[in-house]
């Protein structure tokens, strides 16, 4: 029930930051951790699906005719890519840490605004949860006498039971909709307030902190340049690791093409 209330609240508060109000049950996860998790899942899925596609191709008539032996080199390619990820990990972590450090002040100001709005809307959320629980209890009491009829199980009884339950379901739906509308009405001013505060922060940063914006831009550019320089050795290692695989692919393909050409000439 609590999760339902919190989910509804999020629908009325704009911005992805609003969901962090009530994430108290899970350990905090840094943006970098979320990025790493996403990239890891994506790369692993891509690697597995890619191997499946290669396997299907080599099993096809054309794949057997070309005999490129792509699967023989697959482990080498994935090993090289994994090595690249390991080498770039610390470099990218450093870039993200620097970016977080540079924007710490702005993020603290925005977090303060969010906490203030949260404190204002909490009573409305508590009231909504209380009314929702009361509605569910009332519905349960009305449905309880019908359970005995359900056990009889005849088609006629089931049809009659459905006719009795339908009005109750519609009543609960209408009352829940009324509570949701009331909650939306109560939260609307605070949602607008949150938007206005955020807009004011950004406008102040734009008008009075032009130098800060320029500084953020300069530092971000500097960090990206540093990341690019530090990534060059790892990318070169990747290129060197892939060269034997590409050369093997080239030789196999040309050999298959030559053999196919000879077959055409003899026909």
Swiss-Prot record:
It is found in: Secreted. Residues 68-267 are annotated as: 10 X approximate tandem repeats. Its main location: secreted. GO terms for cellular component: chylomicron; endocytic vesicle; extracellular vesicle; high-density lipoprotein particle; low-density lipoprotein particle; spherical high-density lipoprotein particle; very-low-density lipoprotein particle. One of its GO terms (molecular function) is high-density lipoprotein particle receptor binding. It holds the Pfam family Apolipoprotein. One of its GO terms (biological process) is triglyceride homeostasis. The modification Methionine sulfoxide is found at residues 110, 136. Keywords: Cholesterol metabolism, HDL, Lipid metabolism, Lipid transport, Lipoprotein, Oxidation, Palmitate, Phosphoprotein, Repeat, Secreted, Signal, Steroid metabolism, Sterol metabolism, Transport. Belongs to the apolipoprotein A1/A4/E family. Participates in the reverse transport of cholesterol from tissues to the liver for excretion by promoting cholesterol efflux from tissues and by acting as a cofactor for the lecithin cholesterol acyltransferase (LCAT). As part of the SPAP complex, activates spermatozoa motility. This is Apolipoprotein A-I. It comes from Macaca mulatta.
């Amino acid at each position: 029930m609590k999760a339902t209330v919190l989910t509804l609240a999020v629908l009325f508060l704009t911005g992805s930051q609003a969901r962090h109000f009530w994430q108290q049950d899970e350990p905090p996860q840094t943006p970098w951790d979320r990025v790493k998790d996403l990239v890891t899942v994506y790369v692993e899925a891509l690697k597995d699906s890619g191997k499946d596609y290669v396997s299907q191709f080599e099993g096809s008539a054309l794949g057997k005719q070309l005999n490129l032996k792509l699967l023989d080199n697959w482990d080498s390619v994935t090993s090289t890519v994994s090595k690249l990820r390991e080498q770039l990990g610390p470099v990218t972590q450093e870039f993200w840490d620097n970016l977080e450090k540079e924007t710490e002040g702005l993020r603290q100001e925005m977090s303060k605004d969010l906490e203030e709005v949260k404190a204002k809307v909490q009573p409305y959320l508590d009231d909504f949860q209380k009314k929702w629980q009361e509605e569910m209890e009332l519905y349960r009491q009305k449905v309880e006498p019908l359970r005995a009829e359900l056990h009889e199980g005849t088609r006629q009884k089931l049809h009659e039971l459905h006719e009795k339950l339908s009005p109750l379901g519609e009543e609960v739906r209408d009352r829940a909709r009324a509570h949701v509308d009331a909650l939306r009405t109560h939260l609307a001013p605070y949602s607008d307030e949150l938007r206005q505060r955020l807009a004011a922060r950004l406008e102040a940063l734009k008008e009075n902190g032009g130098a800060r914006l320029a500084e953020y831009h300069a530092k971000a550019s500097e960090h990206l340049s540093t990341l690019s320089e530090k990534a060059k050795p790892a990318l070169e290692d990747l290129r060197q690791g892939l060269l034997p695989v590409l050369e093997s692919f080239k030789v196999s393909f040309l050999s298959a093409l030559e053999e196919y050409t000879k077959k055409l000439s003899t026909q």
